[in-house]
């Protein structure tokens, strides 16, 4: 991580599920706390898989967090003594989180966000792509494909052990029983319009 000469910037940590995003966010938070910086950690209220008031990684590490229902609530908890603002599972917030993050960085806060850059369909997830484009630093992590062991950049949703349809809801909170990390070649999305179109064109090609 390079050193900023000015205070106030945005760091994005992204990748598939089980790639270590929350673990990396927690590591940066603890490092800031060790340096005697005041850190405020936030998470969407919708994410209560492991704890309602903590960010918990899949390997069990955790840090106390403030659950918020919408991005605008974050500012209510920021004070002049705050140095670092960290937001986990940022993909669950609406696009307004981009404005909140921009304002905080412009005002001199170090902002760290972590989230999925792709949804289970393999498509850009919520505000994360925009946050990546405006960030000073982007760390894209990879997991390990559960099928072949290759680097995994996608998240496979499983319903009763079977790949979920493209038309399933995008937001469905789950943990290891609902999702697996997959590589490009083993990521399955039944009923995907683009893939169905490609298959049809291939079948009709002379």
From Swiss-Prot:
Keywords assigned: ATP-binding, Cytoplasm, DNA synthesis, Kinase, Metal-binding, Nucleotide-binding, Transferase, Zinc
Entry's localization field: Cytoplasm
Active-site annotation: 89
Annotated binding of ATP, by residue: 15-22, 88-91
Residues bound to Zn(2+): 145, 148, 183, 186
SUPFAM superfamilies per the UniProt record, alphabetical: Glucocorticoid receptor-like (DNA-binding domain), P-loop containing nucleoside triphosphate hydrolases
One record GO biological process: DNA biosynthetic process
Reaction(s) catalysed (UniProt annotation): thymidine + ATP = dTMP + ADP + H(+)
GO-annotated cellular components: cytosol
Broadest EC class assigned to this enzyme: transferase
EC number of this enzyme: 2.7.1.21
Residue ranges, annotated region (Disordered): 183-206
Gene Ontology molecular-function annotations: ATP binding; thymidine kinase activity; zinc ion binding
Entries under Pfam families matching the protein: TK
Primary localisation category: cytoplasm
Record note on quaternary structure: Homotetramer.
Entry similarity comment: Belongs to the thymidine kinase family.
Protein name: Thymidine kinase
Source organism: Anoxybacillus flavithermus (strain DSM 21510 / WK1)
């Amino acid at each position: 991580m390079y050193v900023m000469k000015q205070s106030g910037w945005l760091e994005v940590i992204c990748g598939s599920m089980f790639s270590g995003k929350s673990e990396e966010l927690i590591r940066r938070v603890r490092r800031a706390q060790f340096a005697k910086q005041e850190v405020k950690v936030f998470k969407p209220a919708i994410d209560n898989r492991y704890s309602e008031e903590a960010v918990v990684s899949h390997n069990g590490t955790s840090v106390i967090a403030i659950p918020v229902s919408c991005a605008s609530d974050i500012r209510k908890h920021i004070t002049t003594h705050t140095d670092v603002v960290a937001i986990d599972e940022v993909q669950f917030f609406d696009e307004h989180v981009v404005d909140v993050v921009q304002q905080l960085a412009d005002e001199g806060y170090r902002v760290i966000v972590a989230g999925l850059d792709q949804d289970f369909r393999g498509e850009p997830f919520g505000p994360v792509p925009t946050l990546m484009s405006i960030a000073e630093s982007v760390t894209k992590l990879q997991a390990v494909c559960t099928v072949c062991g290759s680097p995994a950049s996608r998240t496979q949703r499983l319903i009763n052990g079977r790949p979920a349809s493209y038309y399933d809801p995008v937001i469905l909170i789950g943990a290891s029983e609902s999702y697996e990390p997959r590589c490009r070649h083993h990521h399955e999305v039944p009923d995907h319009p683009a893939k169905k179109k490609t298959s049809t064109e291939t079948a009709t090609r002379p």
